[in-house]
């Protein structure tokens, strides 16, 4: 399919327009700030697909309306979706700002004494706030000399956080959420809210009945050669777990083979429906070859599909992973049970980090007392205050086994462009494929089963819809926990031991929903959550502010919270500011 161009970041160097030596003395310094900003972003950030980020710098420094308009014309022609304005000096506030109301924007005012960059920053932000076009403020903590071309660490942190979140906003705009099926078992997140996607994310919803998946499989609307490759890959790499079904429900070898084949076909066809597949056009299936321009999807499955056909566990797990029979590649975002709101949290996490996401039920809170009663052993270390069992039959990415390694040799989940084939193979080797339990999945299927390594930093998130308020975001930073094998086996056996498990210990603050682990579980807004690698809650907070989604629960340090400057005018308590500002400005793409 034709590659849609990726959004770029526009850099706007603004300058004092007075000639006779004033502007002339500032041209080089101002343009160098723009170049340094672009170089930093290009070096440190990639698109979620792995492509290098492109920065577009205005052809000239911007002193007023004419040069601002020329800059906007250039940006409009080059798909600029995010802008950063930079200056070391006084400039003319409202005459030089970026006025596009839907484009995330930041201003870096150089902290120097020779020229008042801070004064312009304050004046420009005042104009933004008065006009109702929020912008992010960037101002270094320490004074720099005029000839200092370095970017201080605190400025770099804000530039990169803004750029990551801004690119996520721009990348989602114009894409679609593919809803395959409808509401699964009454789960509210699968009541797909078109207005939410349109007004807050700038996306469309493509609703497709599950019979379309059936049609594609039955009528061979797929690449038949690829199917053979996928089957050969599975035969080489799949390690099968215990079949816990009663004897009358166990399948024979031929039946198991048919279930595997259909499971792989489901993965292929859902992928083709999301992004298209030119091979289908070569077969004369031009319409089907186009796909639905989907950046995320969900599959209802239960129960109208799973009562008669193989479940979506294998397809979802493989699509959400960073690898399959085609090798290492960008993960897809596919929500089990068509939980679109958890799918959005997965989408946020992937766009911010480039990594695969772990979709899970927020299944059980285990108190230290309960664990000791059941196992006779005490929790300790990161788990000493209790743990949450995150487990779901469906779409946890196989990367979640954490068999990949960071630069220090520690377990992690890497952006897909950093993953070696050996690491992908290690994740596969750590996974068992267990026959689905018949009473739950009458059509069969295979569930992935792995155990996440312990001591890995994660951020758990969830988007919820509240009537009268709209979407809210929950964030809980914490760590995976490794339990003694005997303890894990005893606890795991009390639920469904054929599914993947992550034992999660949130970081506690002693306040509110983070008073203790029980409070985290009790305040979680739905039955599902998402794990994103790393402590990246601050990035989620910045992204949410750009989209006007208030954060109702988080344990991120206040010093890391980065929102538009206008939020400070909405009261004195930081979280109340967020609610009032989001209500005041409304969704980014108001409908």
Swiss-Prot record:
Keywords: Carbohydrate metabolism, Cytoplasm, Fucose metabolism, Isomerase, Manganese, Metal-binding. Mn(2+) binds at residues 337, 361, 528. InterPro entries: Fuc/Ara_isomerase_C, Fuc_iso_dom3_sf, Fuc_isomerase_C, Fucose_iso_dom1_sf, Fucose_iso_N1, Fucose_isomerase, Fucose_isomerase_dom2_sf, Fucose_isomerase_N/cen_sf. It catalyses: L-fucose = L-fuculose. The keyword Nucleotide-binding does not apply. The active site is at residues 337, 361. GO terms for molecular function: arabinose isomerase activity; L-fucose isomerase activity; manganese ion binding. Its cofactor is Mn(2+). Its main location: cytoplasm. GO terms for biological process: D-arabinose catabolic process; L-fucose catabolic process. It is found in: Cytoplasm. Its EC number is 5.3.1.25. One of its GO terms (cellular component) is cytoplasm. The keyword Cell inner membrane does not apply. Pathway: Carbohydrate degradation; L-fucose degradation; L-lactaldehyde and glycerone phosphate from L-fucose: step 1/3. Homohexamer. Belongs to the L-fucose isomerase family. Converts the aldose L-fucose into the corresponding ketose L-fuculose. This is L-fucose isomerase. The lineage of its organism: Bacteria, Pseudomonadati, Pseudomonadota, Gammaproteobacteria, Enterobacterales. The gene is fucI.
């Amino acid at each position: 399919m034709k590659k849609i161009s990726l959004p770029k970041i526009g850099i706007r160097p603004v300058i004092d327009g007075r000639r006779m030596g004033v502007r002339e003395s500032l041209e080089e310094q101002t343009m160098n700030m723009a170049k340094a900003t672009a170089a930093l972003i290009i070096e440190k950030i990639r698109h979620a697909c792995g492509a290098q980020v492109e920065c577009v710098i205005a052809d000239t420094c911007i002193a007023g309306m004419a040069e601002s308009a020329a800059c906007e014309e250039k940006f409009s022609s080059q798909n600029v979706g995010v802008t950063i304005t930079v200056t070391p000096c006084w400039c003319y506030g409202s005459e030089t700002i970026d006025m596009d109301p839907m484009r995330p924007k930041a201003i870096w005012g150089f902290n120097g004494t020779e020229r008042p960059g801070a004064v312009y920053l304050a004046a420009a932000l005042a104009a933004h706030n008065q006009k109702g076009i929020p912008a992010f403020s960037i101002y270094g903590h320490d004074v720099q000399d005029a000839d200092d071309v370095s970017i201080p660490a605190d400025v770099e942190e804000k530039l990169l956080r803004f750029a990551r979140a801004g690119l996520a906003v721009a990348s989602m705009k114009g894409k679609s959420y593919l809803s395959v099926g409808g509401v699964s078992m009454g789960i509210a997140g699968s009541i797909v809210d078109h207005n939410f996607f349109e007004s807050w994310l700038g996306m469309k919803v493509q609703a497709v009945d599950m019979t379309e998946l059936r049609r594609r499989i039955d009528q061979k609307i797929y690449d038949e050669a690829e199917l053979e490759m996928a089957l050969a890959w599975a035969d080489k790499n799949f390690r099968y777990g215990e079949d816990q079904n009663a004897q009358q429900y166990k399948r024979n070898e031929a039946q198991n083979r048919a279930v595997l084949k259909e499971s792989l076909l489901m993965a292929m066809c859902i992928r083709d429906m999301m992004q298209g597949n030119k091979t289908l056009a070569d077969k004369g299936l031009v319409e089907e070859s186009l796909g639905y321009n989907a950046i995320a999807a969900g599959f209802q499955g239960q129960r109208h599909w799973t009562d008669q056909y193989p479940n979506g566990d294998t397809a979802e797990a493989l699509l959400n992973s960073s690898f399959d029979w085609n090798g290492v590649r960008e993960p897809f975002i596919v929500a089990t049970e068509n939980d679109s709101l958890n799918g959005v949290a997965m989408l946020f996490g992937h766009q911010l980090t480039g990594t695969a996401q772990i979709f899970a039920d927020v299944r059980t809170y285990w108190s230290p007392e309960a664990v000791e009663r059941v196992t006779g052993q005490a929790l300790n270390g990161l788990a000493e205050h209790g743990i949450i069992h995150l487990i779901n039959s469906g779409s946890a990415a196989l990367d979640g086994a954490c068999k990949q390694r960071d630069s220090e040799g520690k377990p992690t989940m890497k952006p897909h462009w950093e993953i070696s084939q050996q690491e992908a193979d290690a994740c596969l080797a750590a996974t068992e494929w267990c026959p689905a339990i018949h009473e739950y999945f009458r059509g069969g299927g295979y569930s992935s089963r792995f155990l996440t390594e312990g001591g890995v930093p994660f951020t758990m998130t969830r988007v919820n819809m509240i009537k009268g308020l709209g979407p809210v975001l929950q964030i809980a930073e914490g760590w995976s926990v490794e339990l003694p094998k005997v303890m894990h086996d005893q606890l795991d056996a009390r639920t469904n031991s054929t599914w993947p498990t992550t034992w999660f210990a949130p970081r506690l603050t002693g306040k509110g929903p983070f008073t203790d682990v029980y409070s985290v579980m009790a305040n979680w807004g739905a039955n599902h959550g998402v794990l994103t690698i790393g402590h990246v809650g601050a990035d989620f907070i910045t992204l949410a502010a750009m989209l006007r989604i208030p954060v109702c629960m988080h344990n991120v340090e206040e010093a890391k919270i980065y929102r538009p400057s206008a939020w400070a005018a909405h009261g004195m308590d930081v979280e109340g500011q967020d609610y009032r500002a989001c209500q005041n400005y409304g969704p980014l793409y108001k409908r």
